[in-house]
Each structure stands twice: as C-alpha cells, then as structure tokens.
C-alpha cells in the first residue's frame, strides 16, 4: 500500500476529488493548509498574514500561501494511476502547482471491523 499526499491549489480541490472519485478512490482526507515553496511567495496569490504577534515576529519575510492537502491510501498497483490523475488535474505549468508525495504504508486497520491490510482501505 502507498499513501499519496498531494498539496494543491485551493481552486483545484473539487475537480481533483471528482476525478479520484470517478476512478474509485473516494476515501481520502482533505485539509486546508498554508505553506510555501522555495520561492517564499508567489506574486498574485493571497498570502496568509499571521495574527499571533510572537509567531509573526518569527515569520520574518516568509509569507504563507493557502493550499489544500489531500491524503489517500491505495494499493501499490494503483499508486501511479492516482499520481498521474492528480497531476493531470493540477498541472498548469506555473510555479505553485503543488507537490505529491508517495509513502509506503506498512499496514492499515479498520477500527470497526478489525479488517487489516488492503481489506481495511478498499
């Protein structure tokens, strides 16, 4: 099994979920996150102003951009399809398109039924 973690633009989350659902991958976790790439900020994108004074002083010149992070666990043989599908929806060719991480998952357990392994994620 693989965990696919994708950090994408907020305006791409709905289409990404639709495509993954159409492929049979509807189980996922989605979060609103803030972050930045090596460019520190992207001109034209909204930045997140930190309200807490202590954190703001530590922030310095760094500005954080709102993003969405989705995470889903899929069988090994489906990882490439999921990654390619996420890329197809989210690639604009511009800085800020996002990142996709693919991580190995040793095991999974469905709490309600005690199913484990791929049975717990399918």
Curated annotation (Swiss-Prot):
Q: Which domain of life is it from?
A: Archaea
Matching Gene3D superfamilies, A to Z? Answer: 3.30.70.120
This protein's GO cellular component annotations are:
cytosol
**A GO MF term:** ATP binding
Output the InterPro entries linked to this UniProt entry. N-reg_PII, N-reg_PII-like_a/b, N-reg_PII/ATP_PRibTrfase_C, N-reg_PII_CS
Q: Which GO terms describe its biological process?
A: nitrogen fixation; regulation of nitrogen utilization
Query: Keywords on this record?
Result: Nitrogen fixation, Transcription, Transcription regulation
Q: Which family does it belong to?
A: Belongs to the P(II) protein family.
Task: Summarize the protein's role.
Answer: Could be involved in the regulation of nitrogen fixation.
What is this protein's record name? Nitrogen fixation nifHD region GlnB-like protein 2
Native species of this protein? Methanobacterium ivanovii
């Amino acid at each position: 099994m693989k965990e696919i973690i994708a950090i994408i633009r907020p305006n791409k989350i709905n289409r990404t979920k639709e495509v993954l659902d159409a492929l049979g991958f509807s189980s996922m976790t989605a979060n609103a996150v803030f972050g930045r790439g090596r460019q520190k900020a992207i001109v034209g994108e909204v930045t997140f102003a930190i309200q807490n004074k202590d954190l703001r002083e530590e922030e310095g010149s760094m500005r954080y951009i709102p993003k969405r992070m989705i995470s889903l666990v899929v069988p090994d043989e489906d990882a490439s399809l999921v990654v390619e599908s996420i890329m197809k929806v989210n690639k604009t060719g511009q800085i800020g398109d996002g990142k996709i991480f693919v991580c190995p998952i040793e095991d999974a357990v469905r709490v309600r039924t005690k199913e484990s392994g791929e049975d717990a994620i399918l």
